[in-house]
A protein has these predicted regions:
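N-terminal hydrophobic or amphipathic helices/low-complexity stretches enriched
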Residues: 1-14
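Structural motif
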Residues: 26-34
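Glycine-rich ThDP/TPP pyrophosphate-binding loop and its adjacent helix/strand module
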Residues: 78-79, 87, 125-308
Length: 308
C-alpha cells in the first residue's frame, strides 16, 4: 500500500490530529504522539511490508469476545492488512499509545478520520487503552513487557514455517523495567530469532514521573547487547537514522533500535509539565486555551475550537 505523503508529513499529521483530539476532550495521551510520531510514521509509511486493510475504514463496535455466538470475532490487525507469509506483522506493545496509533492509521489511509469520533465510547472498539480488537492491534498488551515476548514467539513460529515476513515490535522505555522484556530478549537471542525487530521509544517518562526517579535502567543499548541482541542507538526523531538502523546486519540475533526521543517534540509548551506528561489533562480553562493557542502555532494550524 503506497502513500503519497512523505514520512515527515505523516508524522506532523499524527501530532496535529492527537493535539486536536486532546484539546477538544480536555486531555489525552499527548506526549506519546510527541515522542513516537516519527517512529510510527516511518514504520507505516516506509519500513513495514503490509497488504491492503481487510477491515472497514470506520471501525465496527466491539461485538464481544470469541464465542459460539460470535464466530466473526477478529483482532484489529486487519487494519495492517492480511497475515500473509510475505507480509510483516506489527505488535504495538504499549497499549496507552493507542491514540497515536489510530492517528497513524488515519494519516496513512488505513482508517477513516470518522473512526476517531468513536474513541473511548461505550461499546466502541476504538479504545483509549488499545485492546486486541482495537484498530492496528493484534494482541492485548495491558501488561507492559508482554509485547516483545509475543513478538518473539510469533517470529519464531514464522521462521519455523519458512515465512519471509518479519515481526516488528513497537515498545516504550517503561517496559525496560519489566523482567519479562529481558527474558524475551535472551530467549530470542538463544534461538537465533533474527526475523524479530523492535524499536524502543525512549522518552524518559512514565505514569509516575521521570524514568530516572521511578527506576533508572542505565545504558539500555549495552543491556540489550549483553542479553544477546544486536542494538543500535539513534535519535528517534531522525527518519534517516531509522532507515540506516533497520539495515544493520544481525545474523542470529534480534535487532533492537533504541530511539531516544522528547515527550514534547513539536509541542514545546508541554515542557513546563515535564515529567508529569503521561496523560495530559489541562488544569484550568485558562491553561487549556493557552496550550491550544501556543501548540497550534507551533504545529502550523489554527487554534482548536472547543466547548468548555
Amino acid at each position: 500500500m503506497i502513500n503519497a505523503k512523505t514520512t515527515e508529513e505523516v508524522a506532523l499529521g499524527i501530532r496535529r490530529r492527537v493535539f486536536e483530539h486532546s484539546i477538544r476532550n480536555n486531555g489525552g495521551y499527548l506526549s506519546q504522539a510527541c515522542s513516537a510520531a516519527d517512529q510510527l510514521a516511518w514504520l507505516y509509511n516506509e519500513e513495514l511490508r503490509l497488504g491492503e486493510p481487510t477491515l472497514p475504514m470506520i471501525p465496527k463496535s466491539f461485538a464481544g469476545v470469541p464465542s459460539a455466538t460470535n464466530r466473526d470475532y477478529h483482532t484489529g490487525a486487519g487494519y495492517n492488512g492480511p497475515p500473509e507469509p510475505q507480509c510483516d506483522r506489527l505488535i504495538i506493545a504499549p497499549a496507552h499509545y493507542a491514540l497515536a496509533a489510530y492517528a497513524t492509521l488515519i494519516e496513512v489511509g488505513r482508517m477513516a478520520a470518522e473512526g476517531l469520533e468513536m474513541f473511548n465510547r461505550d461499546g466502541s472498539s476504538v479504545e483509549m487503552i488499545g485492546a486486541e480488537h482495537s484498530p492496528g492491534m493484534e494482541v492485548h498488551n495491558g501488561t507492559l513487557g508482554i509485547g516483545l515476548s509475543t513478538g518473539a514467539g510469533l517470529a519464531w513460529g514464522r521462521r519455523r514455517r519458512g515465512e519471509p515476513g518479519r515481526v516488528w515490535v513497537f515498545m516504550s522505555d517503561g517496559e525496560i523495567q519489566e523482567g519479562q522484556t529481558w527474558e524475551a530478549v535472551q530467549t530470542a537471542a538463544y534461538h537465533g530469532i533474527d526475523n524479530l525487530y523492535a524499536i524502543v521509544d525512549v522518552n524518559g517518562q512514565q505514569c509516575d514521573g521521570a524514568m530516572s526517579t521511578v527506576m533508572g535502567v542505565g545504558d539500555i543499548k549495552a543491556k540489550f547487547e549483553v542479553f544477546g541482541a544486536c542494538a543500535v542507538e539513534i535519535d528517534g526523531h531522525d527518519v534517516e537514522a531509522m532507515r540506516q538502523a533497520a539495515k544493520t546486519s544481525h545474523p542470529g540475533k534480534p535487532l533492537i533500535i533504541v530511539a531516544h526521543t522528547s515527550p514534547y517534540r513539536g509541542m514545546s509548551p508541554l515542557k513546563s509539565r515535564f515529567p508529569r506528561l503521561h496523560y495530559v489533562r489541562f488544569k484550568s480553562e485558562r491553561e487549556r486555551a493557552q496550550m491550544s493557542s501556543a501548540i497550534a502555532a507551533e504545529l502550523g494550524v489554527a487554534p482548536i475550537e472547543y466547548t468548555p
